[in-house]
Structures are given as structure tokens and as C-alpha cells.
């Protein structure tokens, strides 16, 4: 009697599992693989980066250029080309790449920041400030954008604006090292304002 009871339970559980699997279809293996694998573009971009950082930099750049030629909306390829332009001192090309990204993705805070960095290196303080303000408009808590905008305001001797930007960082960042650095910026500005 016990054996038949045990067999009935095992058969019931097995049937329950079979019904469960039949009622809830799973994704085909190829769909799961596709979701977990990087895109072909991402793989190609990674290969190009390795070439640029390795023995064949021009071949890597050519790969990236052909990618944006094939798909002008390939933000990732534009971004990498912009980064390489900054690294190689080609600031005008970098600005153009990041402008393209901003046109395609107006909320891309990082594109504004990189563009602003290129403009800073070109000594285009007003344009850099406007760009960092664009980054802040997309993410009002971006510490990098706030610091850079503060520094540009300092260069333009807009002390109160710089201080306000630095104070914003303090409202959004609890890191003691960051807070100490930002407070040092503010103290420096307070001295400038007192000596005015």
C-alpha cells in the first residue's frame, strides 16, 4: 500500500512538472544566446580599440570610420572616435564627433562632458562653459560637469556662479574626499570675493 501511495505521488509530481513546462513556454536557446551575447557592432568596436591601442592603430581607426560610414547613427563608434581624437590632440575632430552624438542623443551627459573637455583644451572657455551647462541640464547631479562648469566660471571670474555650482556638488555628494576638495574650491572663491 505504501509503495503504491509513493508511486502515485511521484507520478503526480512528474505530471505536474510536465504540465508546468507545457503551459509556460520558454524562449528558444538562440533567443537566449542572442540576448546574452554582445552585438556585432560592440565586438567590432572592441576589436578596433584593441588595434588602436596595439600595433595597428590606423587599421582600428579605419574600422571605426567604416562603421560610422555604414551607420551614421552608431553612437558607440562615434564616441570611441571622439575619445581617440582627444588622445591624439585633434580637438576639432573630437568636438565634431561629440556634436554628432549630442544630435543623436541629446540626453547623453558624457558626450557633453567630453566635448567640453576638448573645448577646454582649445582654450574656448565660453564654449566649454556652455557645453558643461548642457551636461548639467541633462544631469543636474553630474559632479564632473559641475566641477568643470565651476572651473570655467572661475576662469571668467564669475565667482558667485562658480561657488553656486560647487555648492551643488556638496548637496549631492557625501564622499569626504570630494567634499574636502570642493570646500577648498569654495574657500578659494570666498577669499577672491573678500578681496574684490
Predicted feature residues:
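Alpha-helical adaptor scaffolds
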Residues: 49-52, 75-138
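Canonical tetratricopeptide repeat
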Residues: 80, 114, 148, 181-185
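Short solvent-exposed coil/turn linkers within tandem alpha-helical repeat scaffolds
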Residues: 70-73, 105-108, 139, 172-177
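Conserved positions within tetratricopeptide repeat
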Residues: 61, 95, 129, 163, ...
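Alpha-helical segment of the N-proximal tetratricopeptide repeat
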Residues: 36-76, 80-90
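Long, contiguous interaction/recruitment modules in multidomain scaffold/adaptor proteins
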Residues: 1-43, 53, 66
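TPR/TPR-like (Sel1-like) alpha-helical repeat modules
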Residues: 137, 153-177, 187
Amino acid at each position: 500500500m505504501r509503495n503504491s501511495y509513493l508511486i502515485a505521488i511521484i507520478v503526480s509530481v512528474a505530471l505536474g512538472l510536465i504540465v508546468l513546462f507545457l503551459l509556460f513556454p520558454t524562449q528558444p536557446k538562440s533567443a537566449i544566446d542572442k540576448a546574452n551575447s554582445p552585438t556585432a557592432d560592440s565586438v567590432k568596436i572592441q576589436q578596433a580599440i584593441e588595434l588602436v591601442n596595439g600595433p595597428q592603430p590606423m587599421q582600428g581607426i579605419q574600422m571605426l570610420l567604416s562603421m560610422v560610414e555604414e551607420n551614421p547613427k552608431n553612437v558607440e563608434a562615434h564616441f570611441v572616435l571622439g575619445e581617440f581624437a582627444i588622445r591624439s590632440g585633434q580637438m576639432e575632430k573630437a568636438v565634431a564627433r561629440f556634436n554628432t552624438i549630442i544630435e543623436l542623443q541629446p540626453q547623453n551627459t558624457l558626450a557633453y562632458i567630453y566635448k567640453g573637455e576638448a573645448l577646454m583644451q582649445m582654450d574656448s572657455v565660453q564654449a566649454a562653459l556652455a557645453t558643461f551647462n548642457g551636461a548639467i541640464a541633462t544631469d543636474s547631479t553630474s559632479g564632473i560637469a559641475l566641477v568643470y562648469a565651476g572651473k570655467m566660471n572661475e576662469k571668467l571670474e564669475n565667482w558667485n556662479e562658480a561657488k553656486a555650482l560647487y555648492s551643488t556638488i556638496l548637496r549631492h555628494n557625501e564622499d569626504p574626499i570630494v567634499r574636502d576638495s570642493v570646500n577648498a574650491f569654495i574657500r578659494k572663491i570666498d577669499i577672491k570675493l573678500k578681496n574684490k
